[in-house]
Amino acid sequence: MSNKAWGGRFEVQPEEWVDDFNASITFDQTLIDQDIEGSIAHATMLANQGIISQQDSEQIIQGLKSIQHDYHQDQIQFSASLEDIHLNIEHELIKRIGDAGGKLHTGRSRNDQVATDMHLYTKKQVQDIIALIKSLQSVIVDIASNNVDTIMPGYTHLQRAQPISFAHHIMTYFWMLQRDQQRFEDSLKRIDINPLGAAALSGTTYPIDRHETTALLNFGSLYENSLDAVSDRDYIIETLHNISLTMVHLSRFAEEIIFWSTDEAKFITLSDAFSTGSSIMPQKKNPDMAELIRGKVGRTTGHLMSMLMTLKGLPLAYNKDMQEDKEGLFDAVHTIKGSLRIFEGMIQTMTINKERLNQTVKEDFSNATELADYLVTKNIPFRTAHEIVGKIVLECIQQGHYLLDVPLATYQQHHSSIDADIYDYLQPENCLKRRQSYGSTGQSSVKQQLDVAKQLLSQ
């Protein structure tokens, strides 16, 4: 007799190397808790509907719980010849409780079984990711709250542009993560759907109660179409997209961390606990954690592209191609959860070199726009003011100094309306104070922004 659940139809059994190629047990045992949870709900419903006896249901449930316990105690070895987590558990269950174990699969297919597992798994992981995003956001808010008055150069094209608050800069990533969090939250509506009871594709002739298993598994709703229930992998693609986009945001932040920690910038100092060294250069302190996060974006985005390509030509309903939905998702989930934890620890322990930042904005031309705006207050058209300031900046570059070093007489040669108050006007801290438009980098505006962020975190 074949040990295959489908062996009755076949005269020749696959060789071991074919079993190994076909099997998914090496990775889908990740779903053991979800598989057992779904099976317990199914067995409970079968008994309540009179499809199996209460005694058989209780035996099945106790057997499943014992398998789950022993698995987590490393007391069970699964077999590739049994293909997947579902058949390995069923085989072990029958071995433990006898014929009652063979009744568990009544009114169910592996098609709706694996879909149920994946919905339960994805729902739990998305909830965990949301919590990790919020935790990182909280650290960002704490750092920003302590650096409202810390001034740094803002950049465009990686060229110094205008002085901004360090708090304002770092809060940009709070809002990126807020949108990521919202996307994950919204996706739960499409993840939290029960496919159990769809069977292979067309439903079942048994008098099952899908509403009962929906309640037992704490799903928010159930699929209205059995074919859709076993064919749908949209929620996996959506989750991979949301993971990839969040990783892109972490990568952008990581790039800034890497730049800020260079000897050329010296804006921050990373903790030794989140840095590594060189095997040949004794002086090196490398931002490897940030670099790894930056590098892992290709990994998660690759999983997204792979899943899109897997589904693009599949006819309804289930196809073995869908076995490829798991490894990419499992790895992407592992990657983003690890990246969020690392990022939180990395920025929580970094030192912000406030004096260096404040001094940097006095050694560049990031206050040039302020000089143009100053001329506008003297009723000079902005485009004319822009031309005047451009010439002053060029002279400064040629002479090796900055706008605060220009003598008043020189300023007045360019335009007679420039007075001695120009030096106070060009001070970086005053540049920030004048920026009071909603969402700007001025201190009062940043504090208002922080209040909104704290309110969001408290919800």
UniProtKB/Swiss-Prot annotation:
Pfam families: ASL_C2 (PF14698), Lyase_1 (PF00206). Keywords: Amino-acid biosynthesis, Arginine biosynthesis, Cytoplasm, Lyase. Its EC number is 4.3.2.1. One of its GO terms (biological process) is L-arginine biosynthetic process. Gene3D superfamilies: Fumarase/aspartase (C-terminal domain), Fumarase/aspartase (Central domain), Fumarase/aspartase (N-terminal domain). GO terms for cellular component: cytosol. It comes from the Bacteria. GO terms for molecular function: argininosuccinate lyase activity. It is found in: Cytoplasm. Its main location: cytoplasm. Pathway: Amino-acid biosynthesis; L-arginine biosynthesis; L-arginine from L-ornithine and carbamoyl phosphate: step 3/3. It is an enzyme of class 4 (lyase). It catalyses: 2-(N(omega)-L-arginino)succinate = fumarate + L-arginine. Belongs to the lyase 1 family. Argininosuccinate lyase subfamily. This is Argininosuccinate lyase. It comes from Staphylococcus aureus (strain NCTC 8325 / PS 47). The lineage of its organism: Bacteria, Bacillati, Bacillota, Bacilli, Bacillales.
